[in-house]
């Protein structure tokens, strides 16, 4: 990929994260006069760039998804540790992020180790700027996805558990369950030799070609609902979080990328599949 695309994309990713950080730092606790949100944002990007170095040297993508998941866990822990006044809402947010990140990170790491490689990275891992752009965008992904949770956890405004927290928790459980079940169903399907060179249309996959992504979108909406009541003023910029997740999964890296690869592999069979692209379109 041309440097005319990769370098500006890297800079734009950093700029976007910086602008959102400036917005949601209002009302956030500070460390030595500096908003904890800024520390979290910097930590996220530095973690990606640190692991990018050996990954590029050894041309491996094996630790890409794992690094992202560990970053979710560690930066949320950082926010919890440096926020003095922690509420039950904060604990719920952190717990849900940790459960999701640990489950997905371990699942993806085991999958790539088992497969030996991830086809998404075949070309980009050999191109310094393209690969760096990908790691930087992951940093943006982590920060924007976590924006609602981080803004709420680090906020000086605290509230008792309310209807938003209850409904948000139920939505998170629903979305997380769909993602876990969908991933397990696909794993079981691919482990069956009789299904070689076939695409899955059983279980949740008979309703959608991407139920796992649907579940992920839903669970982050749940987290946004839990976090919403304690946000004030410019912290509401964090509402970009679930919108960003939905846009990214449906238009950039998730559904769009897999649909493109799917059409190349299975062609017109996808058109005759009973499964729509997404549960939201069924």
Model-derived features: positions:
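N-terminal membrane topogenic signal
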Residues: 1-12
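Helix-coil boundary and interhelical linker segments in multi-pass alpha-helical membrane proteins
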Residues: 20-39, 77-95, 146-168, 225-238
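Central hydrophobic cores of alpha-helical transmembrane segments in multi-pass inner-membrane proteins
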Residues: 43-54, 71-76
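Transmembrane alpha-helical segments that form the membrane-embedded catalytic/substrate-channel core
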Residues: 47-53, 98-114, 144, 170-189, ...
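Intramembrane catalytic core of multi-pass membrane enzymes that act on lipidic substrates
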Residues: 57-156
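Cytosolic, membrane-interface loops and tails of multi-pass inner-membrane proteins
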Residues: 110-126, 184-203, 258-273
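Alpha-helical membrane-protein architecture signal
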Residues: 128-133, 197-206, 214
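Single conserved hydrophobic/aromatic residue that forms the stacking wall/gate
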Residues: 271-282
């Amino acid at each position: 990929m041309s440097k005319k695309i990769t370098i500006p994309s890297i800079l734009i990713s950093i700029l976007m994260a910086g602008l959102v950080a400036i917005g949601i730092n209002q009302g956030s606790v500070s460390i030595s006069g500096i908003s904890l949100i800024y520390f979290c944002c910097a930590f996220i990007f530095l973690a990606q760039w640190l692991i990018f170095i050996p990954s590029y040297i050894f041309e491996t993508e094996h630790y890409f998804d794992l690094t992202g998941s560990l970053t979710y866990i560690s930066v949320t822990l950082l926010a919890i540790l440096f926020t003095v006044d922690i509420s039950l809402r904060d604990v719920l947010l952190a717990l849900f992020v940790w459960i999701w990140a640990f489950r997905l990170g371990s699942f993806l790491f085991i999958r790539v180790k088992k497969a030996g490689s991830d086809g998404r990275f075949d070309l980009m891992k050999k191109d310094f700027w393209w690969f760096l752009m990908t790691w930087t965008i992951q940093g943006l992904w982590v920060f924007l996805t976590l924006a609602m949770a981080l803004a709420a956890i680090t906020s000086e405004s605290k509230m008792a558990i309310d209807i938003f927290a209850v409904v948000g928790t139920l939505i998170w459980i629903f979305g997380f369950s769909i993602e876990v079940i969908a991933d397990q169903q696909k794993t079981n399907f691919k482990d069956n030799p009789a299904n070689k060179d076939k695409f899955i249309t059983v279980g949740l996959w008979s309703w959608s070609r991407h139920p796992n992504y649907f579940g992920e979108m839903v669970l982050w909406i749940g987290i946004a609902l839990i976090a919403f009541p304690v946000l004030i003023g410019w912290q509401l910029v964090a509402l970009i979080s679930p919108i960003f997740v939905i846009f990214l999964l449906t238009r950039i890296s998730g559904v769009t990328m897999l649909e493109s690869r799917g059409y190349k592999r299975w062609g017109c069979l996808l058109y005759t599949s009973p499964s729509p692209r997404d549960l939201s379109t069924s």
